[in-house]
């Protein structure tokens, strides 16, 4: 079966996006791994599917698969690419979209300047919602790592995140601590790991080790997680520029019980087809 796809990227975080409306398909984990393979397939951090809406008030379904073949709940950079894809493909003429993810409904706004703003939903801090194994909720937690105690914040942005504050992201132990924290037994569904350097109340630098993908140039949910953890700790304001290796995202959050809004670019790289 030959499937048409579009290769897209948001701040260097790259995706293979497939219209599963006009060409219905159900991908196996091995097919996802093959598509994502940078030597044998197309190559990407994640595979995104546009699927039929399941509710009248929803425009599309949005499914997300990591490069390791596992389906995940949310991806912010992917959501921006998703929004641009459905407009470019002529699947909608709307500027505001409501899409269904595995973690709930999100709103996507296509701005006149080409940026895309995403309602990433309300962050969840309750340990059972992350999920994170701990007796009670707190603003920060101590984990043992490499024989030392490491202080983290934990939050769900539709997918689990932990955030560490570091003096400088350039020298942060991302390659070593990233996989150790990703698979830490206190996170039963594994976790995305953010290494955050606070530059000023309105500016942070961030590197993210993504669950199932490793370090990537950018992570939208990771940027949201770092911004909300930083605001909760009193380090950051409600409007923050987040600089990742791939570029800058704007994050706005007014506080507990409010949605996080993320703004950034989405670009088409090329189009093609692949035999599955």
Curated annotation (Swiss-Prot):
Lineage, uppermost ranks: Bacteria, Pseudomonadati, Pseudomonadota, Gammaproteobacteria, Chromatiales
KW Amino-acid biosynthesis (keyword) present: yes
Family: Belongs to the diaminopimelate epimerase family.
Location(s) in or outside the cell: Cytoplasm
A GO BP annotation: lysine biosynthetic process via diaminopimelate
An example Gene Ontology molecular-function term: diaminopimelate epimerase activity
SUPFAM superfamilies to which the protein is assigned, alphabetical: Diaminopimelate epimerase-like
Marked site (Could be important to modulate the pK values of the two catalytic cysteine residues) residue numbers: 161, 210
Its job: Catalyzes the stereoinversion of LL-2,6-diaminopimelate (L,L-DAP) to meso-diaminopimelate (meso-DAP), a precursor of L-lysine and an essential component of the bacterial peptidoglycan.
Chain positions of site Important for dimerization: 270
Protein name, UniProt field: Diaminopimelate epimerase
EC number, as in UniProt: 5.1.1.7
Any one GO cellular component localisation term in the record: cytosol
Quaternary structure and interacting proteins, as annotated: Homodimer.
Record key words, sorted: Amino-acid biosynthesis, Cytoplasm, Isomerase, Lysine biosynthesis
Species annotation: Nitrosococcus oceani (strain ATCC 19707 / BCRC 17464 / JCM 30415 / NCIMB 11848 / C-107)
Active site (record annotation): 75 (proton donor), 219 (proton acceptor)
Pfam families: DAP_epimerase (PF01678)
Binding-site residues for substrate, renumbered to this chain: 13, 46, 66, 76-77, 159, 192, 210-211, 220-221
Keyword match Isomerase: yes
Known pathway: Amino-acid biosynthesis; L-lysine biosynthesis via DAP pathway; DL-2,6-diaminopimelate from LL-2,6-diaminopimelate: step 1/1
Catalytic activity: (2S,6S)-2,6-diaminopimelate = meso-2,6-diaminopimelate
EC primary class: isomerase
